[in-house]
Amino acid sequence: MRCSLRMQLLLLLGLCVFISRIQGQLIGGEEDEEDEEEEEEEEESVEDETPEDRLQRKNIKQDSTLSVDKLIAKYGYESEVHHVTTEDGYILTMHRIRKQGAPPFLLQHGLVDSSAGFVVMGPNVSLAYLLADHNYDVWLGNARGNRYSRNHTTLDPDESKFWDFSWHEIGMYDLPAMIDHVLKVTGFPKLHYAGHSQGCTSFFVMCSMRPAYNDKVVSMQALAPAVYAKETEDHPYIRAISLYFNSLVGSSIREMFNGEFRFLCRMTEETERLCIEAVFGIVGRNWNEFNRKMFPVILGHYPAGVAAKQVKHFIQIIKSGRFAPYSYSSNKNMQLYRDHLPPRYNLSLVTVPTFVYYSTNDLLCHPKDVESMCDDLGNVTGKYLVPQKEFNHMDFLWAIDVRKMLYRRMLQVLGKVPEGSPEEANRSRREIRGKFIRS
C-alpha cells in the first residue's frame, strides 16, 4: 500500500515538473542560461577549492541529515526538545533555542514544512537564529502530521483516521496546546508569534474560533499569509492537483510528500534542477535569491509531510473564494454547521496586533488577496510589501538576502533595531512605527 501511494505521488510530481518546464519555456531561457554558466563555473572551480569551500560542502552534507535540535546545537545555540499533547490526542514536537528569562517567540511553519524551515539556511540567514541573537527565547512548532509530529495517544499514523485533519484542527488544537506549553514553561503571560504561509492560516483560525488566545499573544508577524486566495484560482499547479484529487487514484490519498519529493530530486543532477523548477512553478521564480548550493540541505528537511486534507482544504478556499472550515457533502455540512456551506471565519475577532509581510511574485498569496485580508482582520498595525519584484513565497525563508530585505524590517517593528540611517535611528519609536504603518 505504501509503495503504491509513493508511485501515485511520484506521478503527480512528474506532472508538476512537466508543467514547470512548459512555464519556463514560456517565460524564456535567460534564467536557464545564467544557471548553466554558474554550474560550469562551479565544475571548473572544484579543483581550486579553498579549505573554506571544502568545509562548506561538508557542512551542507551534514546539515541535510541532522535533526532540527542537533542542527541548532551544532551552531552553538542551546537546544531543547519538548513534546506537547493536544486536546484530541496528537503528540507534537517543539524545538527550542533557549534564552532563559528572555521573551518567548513562537515560530510556526507553512504547508509541507517543519520547524526546520526557520533554521535550514543557517545562522547567517535563518529567522530563528536572528531572533535568538536579539535576545528572544525562540520556540519552533511542528504541526500534526509532519516528520516531527507523527504520534498520537491512540491512533497509528498508518491508519487513515490519523490523517483526518486540516489546518482547521491545527488552529483549533495544535497552536493552543503549543502556546499554553510555552507560557507554562517560561512563566510569561504572553508570547510573540510569527507564522509563514499556513502558519498564518492556522493562527487566524485559532484567534477567530478561540478568541481568548488573542490575549496570549503580544504581536503576530504574518509572513506570506495564505488566507484569502481568490487570485490564485488560475494557478496551473492548483488545477493539476485538483484534477489529481478528483481522480480515482488521488481520491484515496491520505498523506503526501513524506519522502517522495526527496527521492525524485536526488536521483540525478537533472532531476534536482527539475525539482527546483517545479518549486519555482508553484511559488514564483527568483533565481537571483536562490542559493543552489543549499538545495541539498533544503531537500534534507523539506517537504516534511502533510495530510492530503490540508491541501484539499486550501483548494476549497481557492475555488470558493471563502475562508471557511472544511466543506463536506451538503448533508454532512448540515450536520456539522447547520447549513449547506460552512460559515466563514470571522477575521474581525483577530485582535492581536498584526504586521503583514507580502510580495508581488508570490504565486500562492497574491497582493490583492493579502490586502483584502488586511481589510478584514481586527487589528492590522502595519503591512510591508517586499521591494524586490521577484521575491517569492519561499524567499521569506530561503532568500540569500532575506535578512536585509525582510527580517531587518521585522526587527524594526519589534523595536529591536533602529531604521537604516543614523538620522532615522534618532527618531522616536512612534515615528518609526508610523512610517511602517504607512508603507
From Swiss-Prot:
Tissues expressing the protein: In 14 hours embryos expression is seen in the foregut/midgut boundary.
GO biological process: digestion; lipid catabolic process
InterPro entries per the UniProt record, alphabetical: AB_hydrolase_fold (IPR029058), AB_hydrolase_lipase (IPR006693), Lipase_euk (IPR025483)
Molecular function in Gene Ontology: triacylglycerol lipase activity
Residue pairs linked by disulfide bridges in the UniProt entry: none
Active-site residues from the entry: 197, 393
UniProt-listed Enzyme Commission number(s): 3.1.1.-
Gene3D superfamilies reported in the protein's UniProt record: alpha/beta hydrolase
Region named Disordered: 28-60
Subcellular locations according to the entry: Secreted
GO cellular component terms, semicolon-separated: extracellular region
Residues carrying sugar: 124, 151, 346, 379, 426
Keyword annotations from UniProtKB, A to Z: Glycoprotein, Hydrolase, Lipid degradation, Lipid metabolism, Secreted, Signal
Signal peptide annotation: 1-24
Acidic residues composition-biased segments: 29-51
Family: Belongs to the AB hydrolase superfamily. Lipase family.
Functional note: Could be a digestive enzyme.
Listed name of the protein: Lipase 1
Source organism (scientific name): Drosophila melanogaster
Lineage of origin: Eukaryota, Metazoa, Ecdysozoa, Arthropoda, Hexapoda
Gene for this chain: Lip1
